[in-house]
């Protein structure tokens, strides 16, 4: 469930009880290089110019997974959306992104699951960390510059906690735990959601000073993994991990921090509090970007393990391709909730197939394999120019991918209308250059956001793939010659031509059978009239959804 952005009555009463006034947004516009992009900054609740310290080293911290179970589509949605943004920043706006991502490999959920499975927490975390990375690779999510595991940063976390204590914002207890003193933070707490944690009933043995204080270090419990610390054996709290690891890489200032909307409070809010106290700075992170939840269609429930309404990434990819999922994500703004259903995925799949079909047909036209009537070349050049301008403007406006994709689809629609196949040789000039330019731009756009429309024959350059391509080329050429012979009856007319075609009908049937057989092996042959035939490799998840042949 999405959290409200304003404080409720209970929160206001708690702030009054703590001596905290109503917080105003006090965001400081950074100094540095303007990327040319406007982003919705959760720190201000509005769009701001994205200004980074250095465009050749944009610092970006991403909250990564807690590796205790299989990753599901709710996770995938957030990571794919931010991967798209990262690609746009890099490839459209020329930023070099340095991304650090956390791996929480010790926490309550990991310990509980390890006990249930009768394995060590370390082995469980290692198993699901590797699976997470495989899932991200399968979804074509670019890996971060560096992964940061909690268990490899325990000394740094302890030192970070000591710094917060030294600045008077944390305290240790007799039981060996350490808590952040929210009262000491005063009116500076609540930069993201303008609230503080609601008062909650504490166990009778709680040694917190205030119920809203949160753990920096948790005293060890029997049979739990622990590390030695100045306060006794224990392990880190959740929020302190990210503050420490982000600071280890980026120091006291961070350009971009990302995560799902459910992390805004309390996780990111607590990160801000810890980091600004430790570094003694007014603004640790300049921009916080949050992605909307993936919802199950017909409900307001987010997809989550706790609600048992999730689909694992591996199961999803048995039915749909990563490109289909990526297009599904592109069609909504990254901040919006997105509704999951088979129908929306099928719609994305058909859009992708239509785009690939257009590219294939346009390429056939450029190569002279598709005969068309006259083309309104000037109109297409003008539309291509306006499309490029509109797409860049959309991406600069808080990464408005729905608008960008719709603009591309409009270009494809108008270009497709010009590819009117004719059965006879068309008279007049051809316009291959403009279609070549459109192909190049459309493929480049989708490649930028991580989707490949290029002929799948060319995705691998190893020798066996090249050999296979040559073999299929020869097979398709041989089939074309047989088909042309079966259809060509020079000098014959009337009954003689009819008899000749009937005699050669088995050859045409054999050509059709071969084409159908090749589809079962993932190869789609298109006959473009009697003059040419082309082929492409099919995604096994979509090979039965291929649009019909043209020509």
Swiss-Prot record:
Q: Name one GO molecular function term.
A: ATP binding
Question: What keywords appear on the UniProt entry?
Answer: Aminoacyl-tRNA synthetase, ATP-binding, Ligase, Metal-binding, Mitochondrion, Nucleotide-binding, Protein biosynthesis, Transit peptide, Zinc
Please state what the annotation says regarding this protein's domains.
'KIIK' region and 'KMSKS' region are required for cysteine persulfide synthase activity.
| Annotated source species | Mus musculus (Mouse)
What stretch of residues is annotated with the motif 'HIGH' region? Answer: 65-75
Q: What is its EC number?
A: 6.1.1.16
Q: Might you report a single GO cellular component term?
A: mitochondrion
Sequence positions that bind L-cysteine: 64, 104, 267
- What chemistry does it catalyse, as a reaction equation? tRNA(Cys) + L-cysteine + ATP = L-cysteinyl-tRNA(Cys) + AMP + diphosphate; 2 L-cysteine = S-sulfanyl-L-cysteine + L-alanine; S-sulfanyl-L-cysteine + L-cysteine = S-disulfanyl-L-cysteine + L-alanine; S-sulfanyl-L-cysteine + tRNA(Cys) + ATP = (S)-sulfanyl-L-cysteinyl-tRNA(Cys) + AMP + diphosphate
Knocked-out gene: effects: Mutant mice are embryonic lethal.
Cross-referenced Pfam families: tRNA-synt_1e
Motif ('KMSKS' region) on chain: 302-306
Localization per Swiss-Prot or TrEMBL: Mitochondrion
UniProt record similarity statement: Belongs to the class-I aminoacyl-tRNA synthetase family.
Kindly provide the name given to this protein in its UniProt entry: Probable cysteine--tRNA ligase, mitochondrial
Q: Which residues bind ATP?
A: 305
Which purpose does this protein serve, as stated in its record? Mitochondrial cysteine-specific aminoacyl-tRNA synthetase that catalyzes the ATP-dependent ligation of cysteine to tRNA(Cys).
Q: Which cofactor does it need?
A: Zn(2+)
Q: Which domain of life does the UniProt lineage start with? A: Eukaryota
Subcellular location, principal: mitochondrion
Where the record places motif 'KIIK' region is: 109-112
InterPro entries cross-referenced by the UniProt entry: Cys-tRNA-ligase, Cys-tRNA/MSH_ligase, Rossmann-like_a/b/a_fold, tRNA-synt_1_cat_dom, tRNAsynth_Ia_anticodon-bd
List of residues binding Zn(2+): 63, 242, 267, 271
Coiled coil feature spans: none
A biological-process GO annotation: cysteinyl-tRNA aminoacylation
